[in-house]
Design a protein with these regions (language model features):
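M16/insulysin-pitrilysin zinc metalloprotease superfamily fold
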Residues: 90-123
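M16/MPP (pitrilysin/insulinase) zinc-metallopeptidase core fold and M16-derived inactive scaffolds
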Residues: 20, 27-90, 133
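Short beta-strand/turn micro-motifs at beta-sheet edges
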Residues: 13-17, 74-78, 143
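N- or domain-start disorder-to-order transition segments that initiate the globular core
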Residues: 1-23
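Hydrophobic face of alpha-helices
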Residues: 45, 62, 66, 100, ...
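Scaffold signal of the M16-like zinc-metallopeptidase fold and its non-catalytic homologs
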Residues: 131-155
């Protein structure tokens, strides 16, 4: 795959065109996750990943965000890893600006409503319990702790 890295407004941007595709994916990855968290901050990056989808200045509720994405046929989600958190939207090329604008609104102008903060705490706790019930996830955590116990990757 051919790709190109450009610096735009001080931000490293990776462009990987795939001519055969009928959609684009805009992925914004942020250097935020467990290896950067202090013990008293454990889990904050994961929690914020959930909260950023709750609304911004232009779309103030999760429903408004979902409706706006649906109007352009976009799929949006986020994922967290040891080194980064990624927020992404996949849509038709003609809606690229719309998708980027929506991600920017959620990430740069996020609004954290108190009722959403409380509700999302429960969602994140349930997600963590789900991982605890997964033998594969449990094995992965035990393996990381065993082999990487003395550094941030062992968290």
């Amino acid at each position: 795959m051919h790709y190109e890295i450009k610096k735009i407004s001080g931000i490293d941007c990776l462009f990987a065109p795939m001519q055969e595709g009928n959609s684009i994916t805009i992925d914004i990855s942020i250097k935020a996750w467990s290896i950067y968290e202090k013990p008293e901050e454990a889990g904050i990056s994961h929690f914020l990943e959930h909260m950023f989808f709750k609304g911004g200045k232009k779309r103030k509720t999760p429903q408004e965000v979902a409706i706006a994405m649906d109007k352009i046929g976009a799929y949006f989600n986020a994922s967290t890893w040891k080194e980064s958190t990624s927020y992404y939207v996949k849509c038709a090329p003609q809606f690229a600006f719309n998708g980027l604008e929506m991600l920017a609104d959620m990430l740069m102008d996020a609004t954290f409503q108190p009722e959403e903060l409380e509700r999302e705490k429960g969602v994140v706790i349930q997600e963590l319990k789900m991982y605890e019930d997964s033998p594969q996830q449990l094995l992965r955590k035990k393996r990381s702790t065993f082999f990487l116990w003395d550094n941030a990757y062992g968290k």
